[in-house]
Amino acid sequence: MKTKVGFNRLDRKSSHRKALLKNMVISLFRHERITSTKAKLSEVRRFAEKLITRAKVDSVHNRREISKFIHDKYILNKLFTKISPIFKERKGGYTRVIKLGQRYGDAAEMAILELVDKTLGEK
């Protein structure tokens, strides 16, 4: 019998879930910190960590693979030129989740996802 394996479906169809994750990853790389529910951020964290790991080696192949996921050229350039060099020596754990407590309206667990070394200073 198949059991739930791999990831949280977030109560959405696959196309909606993929679009949500892409948009949230782009927002994370643009602002270096995002606030949302804990369930969404744990899924976004998985994708963001994989993309940063791949971006640490700047090759044409890696740029093309990441551009399948990130369609914004500015964010793609920022990932390869500003974000990934900061994490060259780090083996993993590029992001952190800070729990905020429950949202007032529906008591959903809220959290902040941010890049660990925020020395980019591009705000």
From Swiss-Prot:
GO terms for cellular component: cytosolic large ribosomal subunit. The keyword Ribosomal protein applies. The keyword Protein biosynthesis does not apply. GO terms for molecular function: structural constituent of ribosome. Part of the 50S ribosomal subunit. Contacts protein L32. GO terms for biological process: translation. Keywords: Ribonucleoprotein, Ribosomal protein. This is Large ribosomal subunit protein bL17. SUPFAM superfamilies: Prokaryotic ribosomal protein L17. Belongs to the bacterial ribosomal protein bL17 family. The gene is rplQ.
